[in-house]
């Protein structure tokens, strides 16, 4: 039996995903050791391998088959646009992708004038403005705190993840439009789904059962 490799997005998400996996009998004690310098963790009994990766890299590992399964946020899946199957919503890390800005910017979203949009997610922003709103925009890619952009006049609006909206409010900004809901998803490599169909499908069904019971 070959190993099935699971890539987890580093941070809180990996910790929560491992807790759910434990509920279906999938454990990896090696990963719980905070002093470990290992990059790959193994459960020999279940023939499973785990590794932690930067969120944006998880879809790449899965598309190319370096990982059979990945756990990553929907924001990363949309932004990276990789070829893979999205099979399950884990209902973890729920938040929203939104257009935000000062209240005065709301009207700018309803006429055809060119506006500037600052974001960490240029592909999501481009898709939403061009394909859904049919509005021409200039997209400015930033890596730091996006809320700063409209305050200092770099952009009229921003596209960003909103959890509670309190950071926006503190900076005199608000949600102007919601693009889509976000949460952690399970993704599967297309070839792995065929080659290891039985094992992967069982894992997905067991996870689905646990999630249904928790609701």
From Swiss-Prot:
Lineage top rank: taxon: Bacteria
Quaternary context: Heteromultimer composed of HisG and HisZ subunits.
Catalytic activity: 1-(5-phospho-beta-D-ribosyl)-ATP + diphosphate = 5-phospho-alpha-D-ribose 1-diphosphate + ATP
Keyword tags: Amino-acid biosynthesis, ATP-binding, Cytoplasm, Glycosyltransferase, Histidine biosynthesis, Nucleotide-binding, Transferase
Family classification: Belongs to the ATP phosphoribosyltransferase family. Short subfamily.
Protein name as annotated: ATP phosphoribosyltransferase
GO biological-process terms attached to the record: L-histidine biosynthetic process
Any one Pfam family match given in the protein's UniProt record, by short name: HisG
Function: Catalyzes the condensation of ATP and 5-phosphoribose 1-diphosphate to form N'-(5'-phosphoribosyl)-ATP (PR-ATP). Has a crucial role in the pathway because the rate of histidine biosynthesis seems to be controlled primarily by regulation of HisG enzymatic activity.
KW Zinc-finger (keyword) present: no
Record's comment describing the protein's domains: Lacks the C-terminal regulatory region which is replaced by HisZ.
Gene Ontology cellular component terms for the protein in this record: cytoplasm
Species the sequence originates in: Lachnoclostridium phytofermentans (strain ATCC 700394 / DSM 18823 / ISDg)
Molecular function per GO: ATP binding; ATP phosphoribosyltransferase activity
Localization terms from the record: Cytoplasm
Pathway: Amino-acid biosynthesis; L-histidine biosynthesis; L-histidine from 5-phospho-alpha-D-ribose 1-diphosphate: step 1/9
Known EC number: 2.4.2.17
Primary location class: cytoplasm
